[in-house]
Amino acid sequence: MTQVSMRDLFEAGAHFGHRARFWNPKMAPYIYGKRGDIHIINLEQTVPMLNDALNFLSAVVGNGGRVMFVGTKRSASDAISEAASRCGMPYVNFRWLGGMMTNFKTIRQSIRRLEEIEKMAEDGTYDKLSKKEVIVLEREREKLARALTGIRSMKHLPDVLFVVDVGHERIAIQEAMKLGIPVVGVVDTNNDIEGVDYIIPGNDDSVRAIRLYVNAAADTIEHAKAAAAVRGGDNAEEELAEAISQEEPSAAEELPDDMADNENEFE
C-alpha cells in the first residue's frame, strides 16, 4: 500500500493551516502551533491518520467497494478528476448538486437526459431543429456534462466519500451522514470534523498538497484493485480445480468391474 512520509507532506506544504482567527477549536488536537498569524498543522499526527485512511480505502476497495472523490473548488477540481479517472472511481469536481446521493434516482434521470441530448447530436436530430433549439439543447448538455461527467457510469451509491475541504463540501458530507456512508476527509484548521470518519489534518488549499492526498488515494485504490484481481484469479483456479476433481471419476470407477477389485494387487 502507498505510504506517505512526513517529508512528502512537508514539501507539499501540507502543514500550513489558515489564519489563527479563523480556526475551529475542534481542530486543536491537530495544531502544532502558530507561525505569525498562521496555524501550523502537526504533521506527526497527519502521517498516521492519512495512512489509516489509506488502509481503510484499501480494505473497502479490496472487498469490491467504490470510492467517490469530491472536491469542487478550483484548486482541487483538476486533481480530483485526474486521480479518480486514473483509478476508475466516480468523482464530483464541478458542483455538488443537492440530492446527488440522497435523491440518486433523480440524478440518474439527469444522466439519462444528458445521454439523450448527446444521442440527438449524433444521430442527425439536430439537423431537423432550428438554430435556437440547438443552442438551448447545447447549453443544457454543457451544464449537465459539467456536473455529471464524473458519475455517469455510477449505477449505485458509493461506499465511501473521499473529500478535499470538508467545509466547502459540507452538503456532500451531510448527505453521506444521512445515508450512513463513511467519509474520509482532508480537514484544515478552519473546518469542523463533524461527520468525518477518517480525518486527514492538512492544508486543503495548496494544489501541491491536494495532489499528494488524492494521488496517494488513487495509488492505494489501484493497488487494492490489483490485489483483489489476483485473489479472484487464485480463487477461480482453486474453484475450477475443485470442480474438476469432483466431476472426474476415481481410478476405481474408471476400471472395468472385473479389475476394480484387483487394483491393489501389486501393493
Swiss-Prot record:
Q: Gene3D superfamilies, from UniProt?
A: Glucose-6-phosphate isomerase like protein, domain 1, Helix hairpin bin
GO aspect biological process, one term: translation
Q: Where is the composition biased (Acidic residues)?
A: 250-267
Q: Which key words tag this protein in UniProt?
A: Ribonucleoprotein, Ribosomal protein
Q: Quick one: where's region Disordered? A: 234-267
A GO cellular component entry from the record: cytosolic small ribosomal subunit
Pfam families documented for this protein? Ribosomal_S2 (PF00318)
Superkingdom assignment: Bacteria
Q: Name one GO molecular function term.
A: structural constituent of ribosome
Family per similarity comment: Belongs to the universal ribosomal protein uS2 family.
Q: What is this protein called?
A: Small ribosomal subunit protein uS2
